[in-house]
Amino acid sequence: MDSGGGSLGLHTPDSRMAHTMIMQDFVAGMAGTAHIDGDHIVVSVPEAVLVSDVVTDDGITLDHGLAAEVVHGPDIITETDVVTEGVIVPEAVLEADVAIEEDLEEDDGDHILTSELITETVRVPEQVFVADLVTGPNGHLEHVVQDCVSGVDSPTMVSEEVLVTNSDTETVIQAAGGVPGSTVTIKTEDDDDDDVKSTSEDYLMISLDDVGEKLEHMGNTPLKIGSDGSQEDAKEDGFGSEVIKVYIFKAEAEDDVEIGGTEIVTESEYTSGHSVAGVLDQSRMQREKMVYMAVKDSSQEEDDIRDERRVSRRYEDCQASGNTLDSALESRSSTAAQYLQICDGINTNKVLKQKAKKRRRGETRQWQTAVIIGPDGQPLTVYPCHICTKKFKSRGFLKRHMKNHPDHLMRKKYQCTDCDFTTNKKVSFHNHLESHKLINKVDKTHEFTEYTRRYREASPLSSNKLILRDKEPKMHKCKYCDYETAEQGLLNRHLLAVHSKNFPHVCVECGKGFRHPSELKKHMRTHTGEKPYQCQYCIFRCADQSNLKTHIKSKHGNNLPYKCEHCPQAFGDERELQRHLDLFQGHKTHQCPHCDHKSTNSSDLKRHIISVHTKDFPHKCEVCDKGFHRPSELKKHSDIHKGRKIHQCRHCDFKTSDPFILSGHILSVHTKDQPLKCKRCKRGFRQQNELKKHMKTHTGRKIYQCEYCEYSTTDASGFKRHVISIHTKDYPHRCEFCKKGFRRPSEKNQHIMRHHKEALM
């Protein structure tokens, strides 16, 4: 057999001579492209073949005696300039063993949807493809390839593949009632709309009963159309056929209304120009195509199948995506199912698998549904909008509709229950709640405050509320004003933004500022690890004198029940006493000659003897007669009286006896990031207020110098507050209830409202 060619075999019940004559006439008319090989005619074609006008001597057309075994060509070739009878074998027939041709008479389309047009049934062992050539109203060709699947006693024909070559005209498709298990595929192509691009989605609605359809789903998700038609209704139309009107139309992407419609028309209604007005809104459906399908049920003679189909219902699942439609007509019967698929392209199975995976991933999200009673009195599943209570038949339309509620989409995660404040940040929400707490701080009497967070929806249709109640967080208070917050970072930010001008002494290690040099010196001990204060009763050491006093009061007070037998130490807990005894017995080897006290080294023992027994400080100051244990302590103390500046700044003439003060001086005066310079002395400053304060020293204004330290200022009130709060502790404003002193009347009033509120009532 030639490449690209095919072989046709003739099998007729007539005589051998008639066959030979017909074969010779046919070969002569093929102009050298065919020859006789035994009982077969071999036809060679390059790509495709169009077989027509095969007649006998009596002028009778041979419509099913011609068999095509192998024909190579494209999927489907449509030619409008050739005769209207013939067969174009599509790609689906190439794998078939036997093919049968049927030729229909040329007609104008008025008698196509009649009961007289019946597809013949052929009994074959496995599978038969029947190709029909149908002429449309405007002369266009529609090719129907029908498939008969064996498996029952009387096989019937179902439509296998349909090509609609023109969407401007109504296309008539004749299909036989299908046997369960067969597949119908419809392909539509628009030749006139190649240059038109549309972003709309295609939707298919098919009615398969005589009482109207119930549309349950639409959009990007499968839709179902229920049908309760019985076989008895089909018998009323002659051969049991009925006309199905199929609407294929374009819907705009932003349309979220209930769309679609189905209608059943009889043959007389179709020939008389049945109107579909009222079913679809023409103003909204820009592109509409109608396909009339004549469906014949040839299985009405089979009682067992008819009884089964009476109780079965058929459903259609339609998946719309872009300009490609994938739909399936599915039967609930456990033994049979009929599918109607509208697809575009060869790789249909791959597309369906990909869409099924996407649909499964999308179905993990839960959507609220509702069941209502439809116009036909049947229950209908809808998707309601929880904002405006509109109902939609698909999740896709509901998603598009939700875009009409931008306010809902822009809602914040956290919302204050006392005002209209909203935010997406938890920290901002807590800070906002703290502002309410500070305002109502005086009236607050309960111990805990409930922090209520706005409900977060589990889905756009959920109304579950989530409320969190937390305990009151630890508050960080500013020691210079009434500001307090639950975040340490916010407190540091507040100190830098509000009180940075009051911190001239800055730590060179961490950058923390202090008002006075003594505070900076105390702070620097946290970096150096120096602990100059040691307990006289134990080995406890600390960097702050106040901490030492607290330690002595709590650990070595007169009222402590547990006292050491070897030393005057007392403890408030028996375990601490036992720990002290273990340490005393195991490590203290230096015994005091005056008591049972033992020390770990000689210096501690000497300090014990001086402070407890002799009260003698061998190293005394010549100026103030203050005693010290070590000569180094006395030397450091003597520098205060002499006023000698031993630490000099390498950038200027500044001198000080304290190295920490020198560090603060260098950081605040000689750092590189000081854009503001004094025009007189060229001294640099980081902030404008510091430069302004410094300029007052050049104007001849009075400078207030502290007699206790190096603090100086031009502000009389600030100087007074400094002397009182740091040195004299002589506060002019004292509380009437606890005698606590304050620098300002406002501080005293705030103290009374906080601690003595009950006394005022």
From Swiss-Prot:
Found, by tissue, as follows: Expressed in neural tissues.
Q: Does the keyword rRNA processing apply?
A: no
Q: Where are the zinc fingers (C2H2-type)?
A: 383-408, 414-436, 476-499, 505-527, 533-556, 562-584, 590-613, 619-641, 647-670, 676-698, 704-727, 733-755
Result of changing H587A: Does not affect binding of the protein to Zn(2+) alone or
Where does the record place the region Required for transcriptional activation? Answer: 515-761
UniProt crosslink position (Glycyl lysine isopeptide (Lys-Gly) (interchain with G-Cter in SUMO2)): K224, K235, K296
Localization terms from the record: Nucleus
GO cellular component annotations of the record: chromatin; nucleus
Entry binding sites for Zn(2+): C564, C567, H580
Instruction: Please give the chief subcellular localization of this protein.
Output: nucleus
Q: Which UniProt keywords apply?
A: Disease variant, DNA-binding, Intellectual disability, Isopeptide bond, Metal-binding, Nucleus, Repeat, Transcription, Transcription regulation, Ubl conjugation, Zinc, Zinc-finger
Consequence the record notes for mutating G139E: In XLID97; uncertain significance
Q: Name one GO molecular function term.
A: RNA polymerase II cis-regulatory region sequence-specific DNA binding
What biological process terms from GO does the record include?
A: positive regulation of DNA-templated transcription; positive regulation of transcription by RNA polymerase II; regulation of gene expression; regulation of transcription by RNA polymerase II
Q: What does this protein do?
A: Transcription regulator required for brain development. Probably acts as a transcription factor that binds to the promoter of target genes and recruits PHF8 histone demethylase, leading to activated expression of genes involved in neuron development, such as KDM5C. May compete with transcription factor ARX for activation of expression of KDM5C.
The entry sums up its family as follows:
Belongs to the krueppel C2H2-type zinc-finger protein family.
Illness the protein is tied to: Intellectual developmental disorder, X-linked 97: A disorder characterized by significantly below average general intellectual functioning associated with impairments in adaptive behavior and manifested during the developmental period.
Question: Which proteins does it associate with, and in what oligomeric form?
Answer: Interacts with PHF8.
Query: What does the record say about domains?
Result: The sixth zinc finger contains a Phe residue, Phe-584, instead of the final His residue normally found in C2H2-type zinc fingers. There is another His residue a few residues downstream, His-587, but this is not involved in coordinating zinc. Despite the His to Phe substitution, the zinc finger retains the ability to bind zinc using a tridentate metal-binding site of Cys-564, Cys-567 and His-580. The zinc finger also has hydrolytic activity against 4-nitrophenyl acetate.
- PANTHER family attached here? IP01015P-RELATED
Record protein name field: Zinc finger protein 711
